[in-house]
């Protein structure tokens, strides 16, 4: 991995842990730590764009309270599955 890609991953991890709400910190932070490095380039670009979205929208999308925009749907599904598996193991 080159220096630019490493810097981008570090920046996205930091932004995942330092959101506007603690709830999204606890959802996106662990996801970024566990899964960000293995995402393909196109999904990384989508994740970077996702980080610019409002936390109130993100939490509704992750919790399934409203449908995410189509461009974010695959990422939101992965994030929700990761959070569910981490926070509600065995369910």
What feature does the model see in each segment?
Residues 2-91:
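Positively charged, polar, low-complexity stretches
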